[in-house]
Amino acid sequence: MIDLPTKVKYHLRYTSDFKNNYKKIKKQGKDVEKLKIVVSKLANGLELEEKYKNHILTDSKHYKNCGECHIEPDWLLVYQYINDELILVLIATGSHSELF
């Protein structure tokens, strides 16, 4: 789905919600290259720059203890690491109103 270099620390997994969200953002004309840049950094275990406002969701009903970052001001990525298996799960992407 998201093409990354073959050599990354974490293998990607996608939820069905993410797959549907991804199709939707492509139809909306979002620059998916921006998403790819962020996912590539996360898949390599790198820290995101401050501009992405990366944080853990502690009070979220659906995404508790997942990571969330801003691709654009109202375009989010929700993700989770499974460290013991070196997997990065892409859970959802979309606007605040679409996800929360």
How would you label these PLM feature ranges?
Residues 43-70:
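A short, surface-exposed loop/turn module that caps and links secondary-structure elements
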Residues 14-41, 46-49:
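N-terminal first-folded block
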Residues 39, 43, 61, 92-94:
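Generic secondary-structure microfeatures
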Residues 1-8, 20, 30-33, 37, ...:
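Enriched for short, Lys/Arg-rich terminal
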Residues 8-14:
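Short structural boundary motif marking the start of a folded domain
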